[in-house]
Amino acid sequence: MADHFDLIVLGGGPGGYVAAIRAAQLNLKVALVERVHLGGICLNWGCIPTKSLLRSAEVYHEMQNAEAYGLTSFKPDFDLDKIIARSREVATRLASGVKTLLRKNKVEVISGVGQLTGNQQMLVETTEGEEKILEAKDIIIATGARARQLPNVHSDGKHIWTYHHALKPPAMPKKLLVIGSGAIGIEFASFYADFGAEVSIVEHAPQILPMEDAEVSAYVAKAFKKRGIRILTQSALQNLTPDDEGVTAEIAGADGKVTKERFSHAIVAIGVVANVENIGLDKLGIKLDRGFIAVDGFGRTNVDHVWAIGDVAGAPCLAHKASHQGVIAAEAIAGCDHVHPLNTQNIPGCTYARPQVASVGLTEEKARQQGYNVKIGNFPFIANGKAIAQGATDGFVKTVFDADSGALLGAHMVGAEVTEMIQGYTVARTLETTEAEIMETIFPHPTLSEAMHESVLAAYGRALHF
């Protein structure tokens, strides 16, 4: 006999659990099916524990440079086991918090593996080995994604790692190859370099952080090289052969020449693959687009009553995108008024390396490609009072405006705490704010955020402090 709900959510990551909570707030009877961890990859083996590791690296770096602030007799050392243990404690604490939130909102959590047997029915094999049939008016698929693997290369966790292995290393690698330079690759490169590993990054694209503005990418590359991180762009990994002592990498450089080099470890960070297998998509004829479930701006699939959100529904594969998509889908299912479709141009992206990177909207290059007559503002942190006081003068803020309408097309930041500031520009884009309105906004002094204001002023020849 089937258990009946208004909504079934398959997957308890940042998209799934948020969708479940929002639907429950709207008085829907909700079941959430999760096979492993509430909180998903982000909370357990992604965003959150990574930030804990990077915070340890940041503190270690600051201790090494304490004399610059008048502090003496510092000889810092680190305990990798304790660094890892702290990151796991943080993840466990937050996962417990998600469980509490779901219980508070009266969401029924079912531990097990779910498979759609109809557009309003799901078969669940629970972790206890039971089979349950669930029925609902609507189903949201939020099964997430997993690390993309290299062809014919197995990430065994010994010498070849995915992000999962890199979050819990048995020892600090001596010589590390990072394959891929998106946010994940860059963050791990930064972390391991801070603790003394010899790091090389190989990237097929002409620049690291390929999705970021070219000026930002170039700045990060320069900063990384200054830290001793080697960067090989326009290069391709031809082969990766593990043995008992490490790995041998064959890398084709920009000139086409293939070289062999030994590394103690390699991290594969070349993107993700959607978890679309074995959940019943074929039976229902649910369409895919380049391996991801095809959806509209509200998360609807081509099959009535079946929705998809988060990484399984395509790029950008970001936790905050998944959560917002979850809210949109839940409100659309509940019949709320004034539900707005997802605008992917207003989703900020953040990379928490040293230096940090944050952006929203169009890069200068993309804006020009789309035919905009652009105005560019650029303001360096070295001209910002708070940055000088903090000893954090690296980086800049770049803004891209439509010269004809004054619309903010994009914002791109590199430097200290920019991941905490990008939301200001995201709000501006969401509200369709013009350059005049931002210029008329009062920014507090002294703050790093004043550089955001000055960048806008600079776009119109009005910068006051540079």
Swiss-Prot record:
What gene, per UniProt, encodes this protein?
Answer: lpd
Q: What is this protein called?
A: Dihydrolipoyl dehydrogenase
Chain sites annotated for binding FAD: 34-42, 51, 114, 311, 319
Keyword field:
Cytoplasm, Disulfide bond, FAD, Flavoprotein, NAD, Oxidoreductase, Redox-active center
Q: Does the keyword Cell cycle apply?
A: no
Which residues are responsible for catalysis? 445
Its needed co-factors are: FAD
GO CC annotations, alphabetized: cytoplasm
Its biological function?
Lipoamide dehydrogenase is a component of the alpha-ketoacid dehydrogenase complexes.
Q: Which residues cross the membrane?
A: none
Q: What is its main location?
A: cytoplasm
EC number of this enzyme: 1.8.1.4
According to its UniProt entry, this protein's organism is: Zymomonas mobilis subsp. mobilis (strain ATCC 31821 / ZM4 / CP4)
Subunit composition and interactions: Homodimer.
Q: Which molecular function term from Gene Ontology is one that the record holds?
A: flavin adenine dinucleotide binding
Q: What else is known?
A: The active site is a redox-active disulfide bond.
Reactions this protein catalyses: N(6)-[(R)-dihydrolipoyl]-L-lysyl-[protein] + NAD(+) = N(6)-[(R)-lipoyl]-L-lysyl-[protein] + NADH + H(+)
Per UniProt, the cofactor note for this protein states: Binds 1 FAD per subunit.
One biological process term from GO is: 2-oxoglutarate metabolic process
**Sequence similarity:** Belongs to the class-I pyridine nucleotide-disulfide oxidoreductase family.
Disulfide bond entries: 42-47
Residue positions annotated to bind NAD(+) are 180-184, 203, 269-272
Q: Tell me yes or no: is Oxidoreductase among this UniProt entry's keywords.
A: yes
Q: What class of enzyme is it?
A: oxidoreductase
